[in-house]
Amino acid sequence: LMTGVESARDAYIAKPHNCVYECFDAFSSYCNGVCTKNGAKSGYCQILGTYGNGCWCIALPGNVPIRIPGKCHR
């Protein structure tokens, strides 16, 4: 049993101001790099998702910001 571990979730990783990391190639390694650099197990480019084309992370740590409903304030 592990203690003190933040919960992980699958979600769009967010930049500051509630914006997704945009991507344009579902087969690129860009999103996997962004996600794993932030502690996720993996990631990929979700094309035409809820927030357009954005990086979706698998098992992203709970302390990393995710895209939430509302505007992206660039």
From Swiss-Prot:
Keyword Signal: yes
Domain LCN-type CS-alpha/beta stretches: 9-73
Single GO term (MF): sodium channel inhibitor activity
Annotated signal peptide: 1-7
InterPro entries found in the cross-reference section: LCN-type_CS_alpha_beta_dom, Scorpion_toxin-like, Scorpion_toxin-like_sf, Scorpion_toxinL, Scorpion_toxinL/defensin
GO biological process, one term: defense response
Keyword annotations: Disulfide bond, Ion channel impairing toxin, Neurotoxin, Secreted, Signal, Toxin, Voltage-gated sodium channel impairing toxin
Disulfide bond annotation, renumbered to this chain: 19-72, 23-45, 31-55, 35-57
Keyword Signal: yes
Subcellular location as annotated: Secreted
Annotated function: Alpha toxins bind voltage-independently at site-3 of sodium channels (Nav) and inhibit the inactivation of the activated channels, thereby blocking neuronal transmission.
Protein name: Sodium channel neurotoxin MeuNaTxalpha-6
Organism in which the protein naturally occurs: Mesobuthus eupeus
Lineage: Eukaryota, Metazoa, Ecdysozoa, Arthropoda, Chelicerata
